[in-house]
Amino acid sequence: MSMRICPIEHKTVYKKFATELRSSRVAIKKDDTKTEYFGCYINDNLVGVVGYQKISDKHIRLKTDFVRLQYRRRKVYSNLWEFRINRILLLKPEVLSAYCTEMSLPKYLKSGFEVQSVGKNGITYVKLKL
């Protein structure tokens, strides 16, 4: 199994994942010029994606955490997470935040993020002060 993580464009994320993202309650807009994405390829198949958006010089929002069902439990999300965090830390933010589904919330809590609020839809807003 050959795994590769690299930056990808929004149009690729939208084309490959929009339907799956929405069915998993992960928000994605058709046009988004503000989010940076990283994709995970296994044997040249795009199987997972994570993103982030710079809210301000000191605040970065983590977004669009998704791995296709058949590739879960293969360290895809862990590798994407680490790749994204390493890139984000180069920007020297003071705060990271995210809106989490039930699927992504455990990883955020394990990484030190604290729950700020829970929406009526079950989406949890978390923050981490660096």
Task: Name the predicted role of every residue range.
Residues 1-32:
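Short amphipathic alpha-helix that is part of the acyltransferase structural core
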Residues 12-13, 57, 102-106:
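Short alpha-helical
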Residues 24-37, 41-42, 46-68:
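A conserved beta-strand-loop-helix scaffold within acyl/acetyltransferase catalytic domains
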Residues 41-43, 127-130:
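Active-site beta-strand termini and strand-to-loop segments that position acidic
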Residues 63-64, 72, 106-110:
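Acidic/histidine-enriched, beta-strand-rich ligand/metal-binding domains
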Residues 73-86:
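Conserved acetyl-CoA-binding loop-helix of GNAT-fold acetyltransferases
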Residues 88-100:
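Conserved GNAT acetyl-CoA-binding A-motif
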Residues 101-121:
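Conserved active-site alpha-helix within GNAT-family acetyltransferase domains
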